[in-house]
Amino acid sequence: MIDFKDMEDVKETINVQGARVHNLKNIDMEIPRGSLTVITGLSGSGKSSLAFDTIFAEGQRRYIETFSAYARNFLGGMERPDVDKITGLSPVISIEQKTTNKNPRSTVGTTTEIYDYLRLLFARAGTAYSYLSGEKMVKYTEEQILDLIHRDYKGRRIYILAPLVRTRKGHYKELFEQIRKKGYLYVRVDGDVKEIVHGMKLDRYKNHDIEVVIDKTVVTEKEEKRLKQSVATAMQQGDGLLMILDAQTESVRHYSKRLMCPVTGLSYREPAPHNFSFNSPQGACPRCKGLGYVNLIDVDKVIPDRSLSIYEGAVAPLGKYKNVMIFWQIEALLEKYEATLKTPVSELPEDAINEILYGADERLKIKSSLIHASSDYFVTYEGIVKYIQMMQEKDASATAQKWAEQFAKTDVCPECKGARLNKEALHFRIHDKNIYQLSTMDISELYDWLMHVEEHLESKQRIIAAEILKEIRTRLKFLLDVGLDYLSLNRSSVSLSGGESQRIRLATQIGSQLVNVLYILDEPSIGLHQRDNIRLINSLKELRDLGNSVIVVEHDKDMMLAADYVVDMGPKAGRLGGEVVFAGTPEEMLKTSTLTSQYLNGKMKIEVPAERRKGNGKSLWLRGARGNNLKGVDVEFPLGKLICVTGVSGSGKSTLINDTLQPILSQHFYRSLQEPLPYDAIEGLEYIDKVVNVDQSPLGRTPRSNPATYTGVFSDIRNLFVGLPEAKIRGYKPGRFSFNVSGGRCEACGGNGYKTIEMNFLPDVFVPCEVCHGKRYNRETLEVRYKGKSIADVLDMTINRAVEFFENVPQILNKIKVLQEVGLGYIKLGQPSTTLSGGESQRVKLATELSKRDTGKTVYILDEPTTGLHFEDIRVLMTVLNKLVDKGNTVIVIEHNLDVIKMADYIIDMGPEGGRGGGQLLSCGTPEEVAKSDKGYTPRFIKEELENQ
């Protein structure tokens, strides 16, 4: 008998029973459907295991189960999560924070599909202008063309011409023969009417214009039928174009069924959406193929020091003088300028330098004595730049390409000026704006423009554009609601942070208007200023109010308090976590004593330091920074302090630190190839000796990379195993315990632990290796054990467990202890780096740097290190960062988290808005000093935070 009460419960809640994925301790729990639920807890407490690896994984598995047996055969069996039962599950959509799109052609506009609607708008409602004359393009029907001919040429003798060739080289012998066979007697070649004769041909090396003379007639009512027939024929032969030549004045007019310039006769094809796509051959700029930039050879890198002579190595790709052909060629070239190889480049004429770089027109004479020949030898010289370009080509070796890369620079395409589109696409306008100009506007500015553009459209355009504009405005509004008003549609997806990518996907989902869906999000508040948090929370509530369930893995205080339901995982991380320590409303949670609730209700807090550090009295000054939206700012970075760079999203923080300061320092200390954005000067480099950029990029690109290999501790672990009696008896070397080389690894999977099944048009599927069952090594290697554990068992240990296991091996302990100190005790030593979040990758890098010796003169740069961190984890992280500063180092942190900001010694606040409204230095000083400022949004939040202490 059916229990209808059970069915009612299923409707109301998502019921999870017996979840044991990763560290989950056989938990049972319920999450109300149709609610905004926050899952919180310490890093490694089991939040992601519950939300993504249990609920989402089961939802995805059930979806695949609906496929036909034939389709499932290709997909392989998706492993069922280790859970007894999940009921009440809707279709699940996961929106994670990883920036997976590395395609340079992907932009905010293409990801959100807003650019697709803009393309449709310009194709249907755009007004075309000639790129030659700037005149508005016109197009006519055949009836209109006949009326115009009657009006303009009544009673006059005219030639009706059909254009066949426009400014192209060739002898066109075959074309003239084809025209003659069709019965036409005359052609107009380069402005002159000529009779077609047998074997007629032109100069093949010159550009030509060719029109066939369809008819020669007088425009009268009597000849109306003949004129109509001739116009139709001309249109057919000329692919929609025809020209009228006045026999008396020899003036020419152009007519077309297609869009045409009335002055020059230039014609465009009927616009379609693909004509405005930089990913389509019909729309892309022919020079840069739609990328907006080209790779050029940087002359300043080829000749970096002009005070040197070529003999001394002024030309970097050649080095110092060698007795070889290229130096003989340059020597011969310089003779005509009365110079030698020992003349400093600065004293050479500019023409000589250009010929050295780009080649000489005439052949050069190499003296017979140099080549031990009986007579002089004449050679062509193509130049250094040509040689480097040859090394860049696809068929050159990887070594040659890498060598050539050091002399290259990426520059804006000189043809499209970065617009990515061809001239034709850029000359369609709506209210004086082309599609590129719209895509460079900040989203807030574009939204305002689109709200008022209909007032400036003609009635026909307004009718056509109405629905498209409505769709674009709706989607832009969603982007505004999730705090992305400072982005532009042409912003490359590659340059977006994880938080920005996630919020774009969130806005796209809200725009899709789906209902009865379960959304699972991973820390959507990453990278958001406190000001924008409320807008994000409202967007999530809007998603809920559509009739969906929203689960958010989050640490943000505002998000927790705004939720309908909170699940707190804990009590600690790793093996000590995996339990639900609280589940209920935020109001109920504030009354409990879990670690999270104590931080929420104020019983526990991250304390403000008793006094701010004074620093070492030295400073780094960056002057005139003007990259992206920076407005020529001068910024002081006092050394020996914890510096926090703050400001709303898009205010210029990352541009200032990651794109300007960090590349300057990397170039100075490590000869980095990354070019800093424009700036005037940097002062104070003599006070520091190295820079360490601890970013959130993955540790490695493949699952073979893991915390053990990245930190270098895996080499020590392998050496430990090599020293064991069993390994010595068998004669094993360190390579035996590596999963990257043959010998000790499982050869069935190549040491991966899994096999990759390529799905062609679907994402690859990973299946555990049936031979080693994911252990990566062969049976013989796994027989060598230390304290009863094989090398595979060690890689499967959490950092916390490994610290206990290796407590008597100082060389290993010192490296893994630091991973524990930065709050990563819950991750596994051999966990593939591709499964680590951006914040986790950043902390592995931080731990690696901490385990190295420092001189007390290092600058550490961190971008949002609190990503993925609980209040307690932030406290641990700040202890680590403070240790670095206490040793005399300087730590520069880009951060929105008030717990970090209030602990800084010095704050640099950027703003006041994002995008074009930002890029200014608003205030700087201690948190107490900045809190008194009346500029921007940050001071108000700092003031509230300090008052609550």
Where are the predicted features?
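Conserved phosphate-binding elements of NTP-dependent enzyme cores
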Residues: 1-949
